[in-house]
Amino acid sequence: MSIEQLARKTVRELTPYQSARRLGGSGDIWLNANESPFANEYSVTCGRLNRYSECQPADLIQAYADYAGIDSKQVLTSRGADEGIELLIRTFCEPNQDSILYCPPTYGMYAISAETFDIKTKTVPLTPEWQLDLPSIQNNLDGVKLVFVCSPNNPTGNVMNRRDIEKLLDMTTDKALVVIDEAYIDFCLETSTVDLLAKYPHLVILRTLSKAFALAGLRCGFTLANTDVINLLLKVIAPYPVPVPVADIAVQALSVAGRARTKFQVLDISANRAYLQAGLGMLSGVTVYDGYGNYLLVKFTHADALFTALWNHGIILRRSPIENCIRISVGNRDECEKTLAFIRAHVTSQGNSSQDSASKSNSSANNDELNASN
């Protein structure tokens, strides 16, 4: 029996998540992983590396609880929000029996995490406006333990209607947990659902330091929920999920000074997002969708050709599962200017080529008519 045959059937058939790093590429401008353009410095001490870390470092838990405005007993930290997704699935779903529900187009790890653990998946596509299709969700709740909603949504960038989220919470009471993925919420904190934790015991919120806090390489995420949920997750989580240096750096990032710096950087990124949106929106045949995170979803007439041209030029963006769309992470101003300039030149060139082709076609047609009349 081969090594491949020894693996679980589910794993053999699994298509792994195509992360930006896994897809690769080489260039000077990387705007494909929704990373922050800021590389902040932190102090790291090595005096405790001979000791295991706490399962849930008290200083880190308290620091994030203070930031989120909730009780420390409502916070669990993990290796990124992705581990939070897995913990929820492993804790609440029975393999080959229960299901999760999610609403594409959205983050791909919900499905992959479920499939890895032999959990069924149900999909209810977003509406044409990329909002929740509540009637269809309600019709598909049988056997569902977890409903995942990403807001701001990746890759579309929009925020889910708050009233719809409350209706979803009402319809899932005593049936399923609703998991709101707020990975990008620090760019629009006013839209957070964290205040709803006090009303809905089955609400769970996922957070991360990877985006606005510019710590993607740290792998530090948080699950916010009521204590009944947190206590169950603590039964499943690994004994030492957060390394000592990770906790130390995260606490610094969540300090008063760290939060002030993040707020300033969010304003800078938001300004660059507006710059990109305005510039791209002026181009013919280009549709820029409103974004609330650190990225924009943009529709082009010839998206594949543009993506390849950018890639070959060393500007690495992210292809979207949405037809003719590319997702562009918001970088620093220099990166945004160079990306916009290349796209503008390419789109203009494509437009001129189309016009030339149309002129030649019309000219040929006119000549044919003249010849026919002669």
UniProtKB/Swiss-Prot annotation:
The keyword Amino-acid biosynthesis applies. Gene3D superfamilies: Aspartate Aminotransferase, domain 1, Type I PLP-dependent aspartate aminotransferase-like (Major domain). The modification N6-(pyridoxal phosphate)lysine is found at K211. The keyword Acyltransferase does not apply. Its cofactor is pyridoxal 5'-phosphate. InterPro entries: Aminotrans_II_pyridoxalP_BS, Aminotransferase_I/II_large, HisP_aminotrans, PyrdxlP-dep_Trfase, PyrdxlP-dep_Trfase_major, PyrdxlP-dep_Trfase_small. CDD domains: AAT_like. Residues 351-368 have a biased composition (Low complexity). GO terms for molecular function: histidinol-phosphate transaminase activity; pyridoxal phosphate binding. It catalyses: L-histidinol phosphate + 2-oxoglutarate = 3-(imidazol-4-yl)-2-oxopropyl phosphate + L-glutamate. Residues 351-374 are annotated as: Disordered. Pathway: Amino-acid biosynthesis; L-histidine biosynthesis; L-histidine from 5-phospho-alpha-D-ribose 1-diphosphate: step 7/9. It holds the Pfam family Aminotran_1_2. One of its GO terms (biological process) is L-histidine biosynthetic process. Keywords: Amino-acid biosynthesis, Aminotransferase, Histidine biosynthesis, Pyridoxal phosphate, Transferase. It is an enzyme of class 2 (transferase). Its EC number is 2.6.1.9. Homodimer. NCBIfam families: hisC. Belongs to the class-II pyridoxal-phosphate-dependent aminotransferase family. Histidinol-phosphate aminotransferase subfamily. This is Histidinol-phosphate aminotransferase. It comes from Photobacterium profundum (strain SS9).
